[in-house]
Amino acid sequence: YQFFDGNEVGRIYLKNDNTISFTLDTKAFDETLKFEGDNADQNNFLIANSLLQERYLSEDLLDSSEAEFLKTFDKLEVAYDSLKNTYKTLNAAYFLEQDNDFISMQKAYKAYFMGKLEMRKFFAKGTVSPTFSNYENFSGGTTSLSDFKGKYTYIDIWATWCGPCKVEIPYLKKLESKYHDRNIEFVSISVDDDRRSGTMEKAHADWKKMVAEKELTGVQLFTGTGWNADFIQDYKVSGIPRFILIDPNGNIVDADAPRPSSKKLITLFEELGI
């Protein structure tokens, strides 16, 4: 089961007729969550395992080399086995369930990392970026990538229905405000299409409505062909939001750039002298 405090989600292991209580500090949710009562050990193990994964599977790990990644995963496996040894009262059936979850997590995370690794190789820094031409501009007319030649271009690929995309909007607005007089353009490209909206006309209307209601800043573009747009296909975009940074000469800086909410993006901008 899961429970929610309005900001974070916690997991809880329950059986019929269980009596269980927990305490926590909402400012340090996982770090302070502690269970007492029936099946307290099962629940405390879940929390400890979650913290273990947070410690080893950091955002920086996804930018590491394959050797560094595999070395960290080996350390995580050792730490996981050590954690199990501290909960010796738990039965084998419970650990079998947790082991299966752990293995599934490993497979999914490794697959995600390998995908990002292949992307880094395929879209190497300094190679010429794919381009787009004549996308509809919310402010009027059409816009092409070549219009931004001479400036860095930070591209946000998003859609109106995408929850994680909308989470990044406030951070993106702050970035645009902070760097409005710098040598960089912020460009948002909507991939809204008929697959979600029913018709392209409805998708287009949804895009215009959200841009207006959310008072989205930067350059707001609509592909007109959604996920089938050449630029989206050329960059092998399979999930959103996706962020891309291109240099003033039209070359790739990062084909899978940090999100606006990540401190790593500011560091990258500073390194580039933006």
Model-derived segments and spans:
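A non-transmembrane, solvent-exposed segment enriched in polar/low-complexity residues
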Residues: Y1-T86
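Generic structural signal for well-ordered beta-strand positions
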Residues: T32, N43, T143-S144, V253
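Domain-scale detector for complete catalytic domains at protein termini or as standalone homologs
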Residues: S64, T72-L76, Y80, K84-L90, ...
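N-terminal "domain-start" segment that seeds a small globular fold
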Residues: Y112-L145, T217-V219, K264-T267, E271-L272
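Short, internal strand/loop/helix patches
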Residues: N134-N137, A205-I244, P248
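Short active-site neighborhood of thiol/selenol oxidoreductases, capturing the structured segment around
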Residues: S144-K166, L172, E185
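Structural microenvironment flanking redox-active thiols in thiol-disulfide oxidoreductases
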Residues: V167-K214, T225-Q233, T267
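Thiol-/selenol-based redox modules, centered on thioredoxin-like
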Residues: I240, L245-I274
